[in-house]
Amino acid sequence: MESHGSGLRRVLLLSFCVAGIWAAYIYQGILQETLSTKKFGEDGKRFEHLAFLNLAQNVICLVWSYIMIKLWSNGGSGGAPWWTYWSAGITNTIGPAMGIEALKYISYPAQVLAKSSKMIPVMLMGSLVYGIRYTLPEYLCTFLVAGGVSMFALLKTSSKTISKLAHPNAPLGYGLCFLNLAFDGFTNATQDSITARYPKTNAWDIMLGMNLWGTIYNMVYMFGLPHGSGFEAVQFCKQHPEAAWDILMYCLCGAVGQNFIFLTISRFGSLANTTITTTRKFVSIVVSSVLSGNPLSSKQWGCVSMVFGGLSYQIYLKWRKLQRMQKKKKA
């Protein structure tokens, strides 16, 4: 009876995590798409300063992580010093800026799909640079994802979707997304190196360090350089309060979503988190198609299914590998 109650609590907690991640990031996606395509006010101006979203997100997450550390930290030391994140902060500033800038050139569903193909640069780098040999099923996953994204990019986008874009340019948009993935790869590798050197580093320490440097770099880029558009972004928000509200909600969704991701990984592992976030991306495309008026053709839906079929198969392979490792430990 006790084990039944414990199992029920785990199911409820997992459901809570799924709902939290889906709600936070699906709504954040809606806001991101709104800010990149909507014409605000009577003058019908677009919010062209999308890099400002990254600065705002850094500031909110910096404050959020600091509060969480003060509330939940046990006061122990041994985590990575704040200055160790300076290099990861550079790539983590440039990568997301490219990803969000891509929304000027391609639709939100296209951006989500392109950014879902993270395994492609990882496997390319692994095989070409490090000589890693992958299994046939792993190559099959990559083929499905790469093929789906490529065919989606080559298919004709609806005129309604194109009319919403600030500067339609598919090659540039997809190029920015793949550069985003490349920079993300360097960021993840650097974070892994930091946590290996400082094992007592927790998720909040990483969030604080990354967003501290992200805030510094984005402040310099937006307000310190001659071509920086920080002041124009602030002025736009003053003239269009609804845009400022959307930006605030966008940032809060990111901070809350991180909370649920940390909770999911700590209680259920990274595989469960990968499954939840992958399905969330698929739902985000469906929501964008239905709510934001980005109609996809049957061929495009086939490409979407192909990509997420490959991602689902990858998750299954990871699950099988995890099961085999657990059996070896028991033996």
Curated annotation (Swiss-Prot):
Primary localization class, coarse: endoplasmic reticulum
Induction of its expression: Up-regulated by stimuli that trigger unfolded protein accumulation in the ER (UPR) (e.g. DTT or tunicamycin).
Consequences of knocking out this gene: Lethal.
Cross-referenced InterPro entries: SCL35B1-4/HUT1 (IPR013657)
Entry GO MF terms: antiporter activity; UDP-glucose transmembrane transporter activity
Membrane topology of the entry: Multi-pass membrane protein
Keywords from the named record: Antiport, Endoplasmic reticulum, Golgi apparatus, Membrane, Sugar transport, Transmembrane, Transmembrane helix, Transport
Subcellular location: Endoplasmic reticulum membrane; Golgi apparatus membrane
GO terms under cellular component: endoplasmic reticulum membrane; Golgi membrane
Tissues expressing the protein: Mostly expressed in flowers, and, to a lower extent, in roots, stems and leaves.
Transmembrane segments: 11-31, 49-69, 80-100, 112-132, 135-155, 170-190, 206-226, 245-265
Highest taxon of source: Eukaryota
GO biological process assignments: embryo sac development; endoplasmic reticulum unfolded protein response; pollen development
Short sequence motif named Di-lysine motif, residue ranges: 327-331
Pfam family, one: UAA
Domain statement: The di-lysine motif confers endoplasmic reticulum localization for type I membrane proteins.
PANTHER family named in the record: SOLUTE CARRIER FAMILY 35 MEMBER B, SOLUTE CARRIER FAMILY 35 MEMBER B1
Additional notes on this entry: Suppressor of the Yeast snf4 mutation that is impaired in sugar trophism.
Role description: Essential sugar transporter required for the transport of UDP-glucose from the cytoplasm into the Golgi and the endoplasmic reticulum. Essential for pollen development and involved in embryo sac progress.
Family stated for the protein in its record: Belongs to the nucleotide-sugar transporter family. UDP-galactose:UMP antiporter (TC 2.A.7.11) subfamily.
Listed name of the protein: UDP-galactose/UDP-glucose transporter 3
Species whose genome carries this gene: Arabidopsis thaliana (Mouse-ear cress)
Source species taxonomy: Eukaryota, Viridiplantae, Streptophyta, Embryophyta, Tracheophyta
